Amino acid sequence: PPPPPAFSHEVSPALSAPTRSVLDRVILAATALAATVLLAPLLLDSIEASRTRRVEQKFGVLSGALHGYADSHREYPTPPASGPLSRAGLYAPTLVAEHRLTADDGTLLVPGSSLSQSGTFRIPSVEELEEAVGTARLEMLVRQMGGDFGYTLSHRDASGELQPIRDTRRGHHPIMADAPADHGLHAIHHPSGLHHILFEDGRVQRVFDPVFAEDQDHLYRNHNGVLAAGVDPDDSAIGSSHHQP
């Protein structure tokens, strides 16, 4: 009689095709998951790096506008010493009034912020602000006029008088930065904790700690630990648009 057929490991096509299909899908899913795990941090880093570059470019534009204003007036835009328009963010309408900034080109917005996503941001004119004094609309205008950036609150002299922000181009003296949260402890627009600072001389610096290591000076607090105007010419606190000196 003929020998019995040798045992074969082959599986009938009816059984093997679905099995291979399921296995292929599992392998593809696992590969996609692994790629996501590996690439997601890189993608987030790339997004944050792009946002940082754009913020630094915006500070470059603002530095040029501020220096142009200072060249003409021998001081930087300074808020009134008192009154409803005595706000950090008044620098923006002041620069727009002299055609040094464009009201609606997004220079004052951090990419991805709520203001930038609204698509409606526009720096109000000084006349709009004056007309809004005494109305509920004023608070909305002063909160938004400075965009996503904060501005120096200047300093007061020994008698308590608010002083003009002089054009001395100091390389260690902040004039603008990312706007602080309302508690004045850190910036609000960068998830990583990054702070961008524009100094008087036009230099832009990135820091993760708003307290300067060399002298323990706080970016958003004066030497008395308050979010208010400085107590001497070397004291600087950066306030959000609506903050008063």
Mark where each language-model region is.
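Membrane-interface helical sensory segment of bacterial ECF anti-sigma factor regulators
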Residues: 3-55, 148, 157-159
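Short low-polarity hydrophobic stretches
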Residues: 1-3, 174
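Catalytic cores of eukaryotic secretory-pathway lumenal/extracellular enzymes that build
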Residues: 8-18, 33, 48-97
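Active-site-flanking ligand-binding surface segments in enzyme catalytic domains
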Residues: 133-214
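Conserved beta-strand->loop/alpha-helix structural units within folded catalytic cores of enzymes
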Residues: 41, 53-73, 100-101, 194-210
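Extracellular/periplasmic head regions of type IV pilus-like filament subunits
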Residues: 67, 71-133, 171-173, 192, ...
